[in-house]
């Protein structure tokens, strides 16, 4: 018996494999898989329920229905194993062979495989160089195709209709051969000689001139080469033998009531068999051609339906009018094999329940209901009960557990001790959505969750449910404890800040404790230590907020690393002294000697983690939470209606605003302003009124007047509950309080435009009907948004994960000197992100020098931690080059140095860390959060009043960046370039502020002038866009004809008239081709030139432009010739944000992208065509000039004769990432995408580290286009993996040959996922059919490098703890294989087993 067990063990061993190859199956291969031909469409006998012989479920072909029993019942039991019954022909074996044995159908006529025919581009079509239409006409018997022209004038592959064929027959007789149907295509494919074709095409390629033809030939060449290298034969795309799926994979299940539930595949197979048999019969009978043809066509159609129903023509439907599910449908889509069963599997040993708060738990614990624990840990309990001798058998143990005898609970306590469980809350958006805890048994039926981990789970207690999973094996428990325990996940992987920060009640309690109150009870007392202060508080001598002096003892570490105690007397409050009791030793008292808002608490925890490490932080966090809850309870903070204090100034402010609006209304009626301007100005007035009201309200709420000890009135921060909640960051914001006690403000319509009548009431006063109706708009839009956007965001995350899944840290250092240049991010007067935040946790790529010296401050390859960042800041360095994954040189992964610090752990990243997936989660998770948070301000329009000037905040020197300007008659500069920026530089040369200023800005200062803080240095009109004259002279109207290209509007009040240019669409036919413009002429009537160029000064006027000058009026430099009214602005919401992020990662081209200069040189304009201008750039070195056609309505930033640099903006618009990559290089495109994505998230106050976005960009840049193939195997213009090209180039250089040159290409994340090397990963993502077709034709083999492929084949992933397993496998594969025991074939194994069994049987 021992031998038998040993043998069975041997059999169950899985095969080790290095990769998975996919290819086309030849007819012989299909027959070799098969165990017999299926000849009849019958399935099972309806009376006996036994499978019919030679039918679709035949036991002879596919194996027995019952274990070790033949169909007729002659041979039963194990001892007859392997015998083939002579009566029914069934082999006696296990029934599970019915899952793996295949059959086949011999087709009476060949049939084209629909995937290779219809999946675009059609492979059969490319192969034969025929159009898909023609091939379909042949296959579906509509026309003939010439196969062998013989000596006739026909050509091979020529199409002949029925008439043509008959004519040809009369003319040539049997000189030639023409056929129809799949046989014809089969013969054509068979006739292709791959090698000859390849040679011919390679020779032909260089001489082809037309671009389209070259592309076509290259495509065909690649296909034929793929066939040639993979060993596939083209004729295998036509099926002669059809494999039949094993019956247990397409089951037929009897239901009660004599009906059957069946898989759709059985119906599809039955159709094929029926038609095939009929066709055989017709051929035997030598039926008329037309009937046979029809039958063949029907056979082709039924095989099409079986393989991919609905790909051609209408889908075949079953009895219930629903399309049948074909083989292709089985594997694709969310319910297909890949996503349903291979990537997402269900878990046993899990339970779920509602969660409640566990305020008394420690951070590493969760409360598990006893009932649940008993069920989840059953096998462990049975084992323990048996082991302790309390139960004799498993059955007895089961009875004990069912009766719930007291011993069971003791055993359960034992089993659970130190056995972590994992809690998961759906949706699991990032890795913190599953964490491990030690269970604590509780009564009741709800799981208790520690409040501090709620932020990570995004959980609240309004009915959320969570799932519990039990790690069973020792390794799983170890991993759960060391990697997933909640105490080991304190920092967020997205930004490296603590994720277990207290929120809400805890913050409120701590804030309340640390506040000070003037003249509180016990003010001015002095205490010898904290304990004495506590005594005074407990006995009621001093209150919590009293300002007192306390002597405190601190422990600090000195230079030598010894712990030193210091004592000092501090001005503080009793509450803060109490807080210092829970402060871990080694932290400064100053950290709690302040008002503890949410930000301060977060900083406190962060400092604690960096200075004292994990353990102290965890304990401290728990203590903070207990204290916070305690004092929040004691504080008695509550919200009452009287807490919402409405400021007295509100009513006067609203009245003023109303008066202003009336004034503008009058101006509009008298024609001084256009409708658009009026709307914009009204909105501005209300926006600023709203600001003023909310300022007044906050001033009113935040301060209260009290009498101090000396009897003098003094202001102090108020103890108003609502104000405390908002100020501490516990709940609510100024914007929400404004709606309660200020005014609701402007509301947005569902389309995002702003309703111009604001809601002046607030919630305390209450809204009237019309106000209520307006506010429902915004609120409803928010709810609808949420529903739609959640799905969108989930899809974005899925695409991100898919593109980045195979990126893993695989080596220590790639040694590159490349990197990204980091500067502080400055927008307007604020430093949005200082340099230290951008470089923290990165590795320096090149030595950083002390400013102005040659002294190295930070050597290359230093990991910048907090201490280094302090040094960088102290030396006022404002740019440095740091390593980045984008410039990492590692093939198939990245190195530790280029990635830098692991944000969730605080040290340099480990090998094997799956940085791709972490990056995708970090970007996707807040996406979902944000989309869910659109409506929280109730749709209140969050738009500040439009800016119309620049007011500096710091003193310094003014610098202009890419600005062109003219000096007007008052000696002031007027900006005449589009993308100009002002910067303020301090005396150390560091940039402090940077502002974008529009065209037409008037500057109050000159360049390099000193400016002082608070000064206004630039002004412009935000509502109109001027056209500025660059020369002085008099104006002359061209093509300005009243009623044709423009109309006059006269103001009734002032009698002033202005000219409004009509849009092309509004003009009569005569004016369509005209181009209204203003030309400047000198006194003598001659044309004036723009200074420094040969271009006449003429300005084209777009539609809607308003001109306030008359013909021949004089004009000065820098004066406005015309104004173009600007459109009203829409509110910025992440709604615009999420699609924006998706567009950036998909690298979509914007609608009207900016036009960039393709080469450096001088601008001129060539001959104009209808509606387009011809822009010509002539390079300075006399190279080939570059031409581009630009639509006339595009506003150009350049004039004739101007010099431009490559990549400079010629016409404004959103820049396209592809253009930036092509013209400005890889680093610029990386910076562009990172900054744009960050802008969207920053607007919502979400922090994501730049690294994560860079990781995605690296994956978008992993393909390149070959420019010149050199001596390599690549084709020019082909798309290849960058790492492949680099490896090939290294080999070529080593042999002294010419390497290939290439240009990097930017692919959107969907395209990049589908273009990955691994076809398994691509097929499980999207477009399964296309990916598999392509892979099969090319005979691709998947090396199983990524995570997804390994999950699909059921292995450990090559990351995390599975990394070492894969390393070992790779090493073992590299070693020469040791001599192994000779492998035995399956049939020998069966034989051996049969012998063993017979032995065992005869010994019985």
From Swiss-Prot:
Q: Name one GO molecular function term.
A: zinc ion binding
Write down how the cofactor binds this protein.
Answer: Binds 1 Mg(2+) ion per subunit.
Record NCBIfam families: rpoC_TIGR (TIGR02386)
* Cofactor(s) listed: Mg(2+); Zn(2+)
- The residues that the entry says bind Mg(2+) are 460, 462, 464
Q: Where does Zn(2+) 1 bind?
A: 70, 72, 85, 88
User: Which residues are recorded as binding Zn(2+) 2?
Assistant: 814, 888, 895, 898
Reaction(s) catalysed by this chain, per the record, are: RNA(n) + a ribonucleoside 5'-triphosphate = RNA(n+1) + diphosphate
The entry's protein name is: DNA-directed RNA polymerase subunit beta'
General function of this protein: DNA-dependent RNA polymerase catalyzes the transcription of DNA into RNA using the four ribonucleoside triphosphates as substrates.
| Keyword Transcription included in the entry's annotation | yes
Q: Which domain of life is it from?
A: Bacteria
| UniProt cross-references to InterPro entries, sorted A to Z | DNA-dir_RpoC_beta_prime, DNA-dir_RpoC_beta_prime_bact, RNA_pol_asu, RNA_pol_N, RNA_pol_Rpb1_1, RNA_pol_Rpb1_3, RNA_pol_Rpb1_3_sf, RNA_pol_Rpb1_4
Q: Name one GO biological process term.
A: DNA-templated transcription
Q: How does it assemble?
A: The RNAP catalytic core consists of 2 alpha, 1 beta, 1 beta' and 1 omega subunit. When a sigma factor is associated with the core the holoenzyme is formed, which can initiate transcription.
